[in-house]
């Protein structure tokens, strides 16, 4: 499968990687599962925003199930898989659980914490590169795939794939925080760890 990504999306993907590294890590040292989940959640959330739903009328964190997410969400997972295949990240199909569950270390941020921390800047990346919300979701999925590739040596490609697939679903089916709201991680829980 060939990746059909525009140059603007490729540039935006680099900005998304920099955003994740800058907001979640110290330098470029970040907790892999948290970085992957956060990038995937942003991708899914951008896709959710592309559907044009009135998100302000629902409580942030509420599940928002839709046919649109069911139809368009799998494209994000396909993009992830295609990128990993093109970059020779081998995956054992028996260890892939996709969007149903992921095993390994849990991300250190909840879905709402991830979105609150990143969504305003993610929307700014989309605007800066003149991308539609769906194009931005694809660019963020590409960024997620890059992070999975970079972390595969330490956590395994399958763990990265599973965390990402679950994050795409979380982002595309969760009402995001309102842009003016900020959800802070609990002070007692570290939000990163050095590899």
Predicted regions and their residues:
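Solvent-exposed interaction surfaces and binding hotspots enriched for charged
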Residues: 1-195
